UniProtKB/Swiss-Prot annotation:
Residues 124-231 form the (+)RNA virus helicase C-terminal domain. It comes from Chrysanthemum virus B (CVB). It comes from the Viruses. Transmembrane segments: none annotated. One of its GO terms (biological process) is transport of virus in host, cell to cell. TGBp1, TGBp2 and TGBp3 seem to act together for cell-to-cell propagation. TGBp1 is the main movement protein that physically cross the plasmodesma with the viral genome. TGBp2 and TGBp3 would facilitate TGBp1 function. Transports viral genome to neighboring plant cells directly through plasmosdesmata, without any budding. The movement protein allows efficient cell to cell propagation, by bypassing the host cell wall barrier. Increases plasmodesma size exclusion limit. Acts as a suppressor of RNA-mediated gene silencing, also known as post-transcriptional gene silencing (PTGS), a mechanism of plant viral defense that limits the accumulation of viral RNAs. GO terms for cellular component: host cell cytoplasm. The keyword RNA-binding applies. InterPro entries: (+)RNA_virus_helicase_core_dom (IPR027351). GO terms for molecular function: ATP binding; RNA binding. This is Movement and silencing protein TGBp1. Residues 1-123 form the (+)RNA virus helicase ATP-binding domain. Homodimer and homooligomer. Interacts with capsid protein. Interacts with host AGO1; this interaction targets the host protein for degradation, thereby suppressing the antiviral RNA silencing.
């Protein structure tokens, strides 16, 4: 337990509870260093084994990687499950659960023992936009955010959307674009998010959040009237 707590502290995770019990729940923003933290745990103590319901690590010579979860674990290890929000089974076999309940709303939401709100992926302009939209996030990096009209700007970089009508519009203009599910676990230098709304629909909040957090340096939003609000 001491190794686990120390490494989470080293990676900037804030402890929220003085009492810890298994499974230990860790929530964080995109780009908070979750995967790097899990890899550090694997390297620090051979009792840890990590699985994910997201994109697994490629094989390496050390044999230390976050593996694809296939449905069962070896109970003699301290098993960690990443992207636990995608899991619908019994979590009692896991020592720790890592995930982002905002990005992937779980069927079973656990109260967090640790959290991290500082993103090392995107910058302060994106963080400010996300806070204005009601998300808890911070960043000390620099980046660029612009909000453009739907027909006033040509999409650049990786184009992301979540509405079917926008997908049809982009295809009609021969623009290659992706839905959130297609870019899970991926990061791009520049992203253009195209939407038919000027605000976040409550039922699509998690999808918007995913679309707004895939970039490192530049984010362009294209909306009907070049504005975007939480309501």
């Amino acid at each position: 337990m001491d190794v686990f707590v120390k490494i989470l502290s080293d990676f900037g995770f804030t402890r929220l509870s003085s009492s810890l019990h298994v499974p230990i729940v860790v929530h964080c923003m995109p780009g908070a260093g979750k995967s790097s933290c899990i890899r550090a745990l694997l390297k620090a103590d051979s009792r840890f084994v990590a699985y994910t319901l997201g994109v697994p690590d490629p094989c390496n010579l050390d044999g230390l990687c976050i593996k694809a979860f296939t449905g069962s674990v070896d109970l003699k290890y301290f098993n960690i499950l990443d992207e636990y929000a995608r899991y619908n089974g019994d979590a009692s076999d896991f020592f720790a659960l890592f995930g982002d309940p905002v990005q992937s709303p779980p069927r079973n939401l656990y109260r967090a023992h640790f959290k991290a709100v500082l993103s090392k992926r995107f910058g302060s302009c994106t963080a400010q936009l996300l806070r204005e939209l009601g998300f808890e996030v911070e960043s000390t990096k620099e980046d660029l955010v612009s909000i453009r009209g739907l027909y006033d700007f040509d999409p650049v970089g990786t184009v992301i959307y979540y509405e079917k009508e926008i997908g049809c519009l982009l295809r009609a203009h021969s623009i290659e674009a992706y839905e959130p599910e297609e870019v899970v676990g991926k990061t791009f230098e520049t992203v253009t998010f195209v939407t038919a709304e000027n605000h976040i629909p409550a039922e699509s909040r998690h999808l918007v959040y995913q679309c707004l957090t895939r970039h490192r340096s530049v984010l362009h939003l294209m909306t009907p009237d070049a504005s975007y609000t939480s309501t």
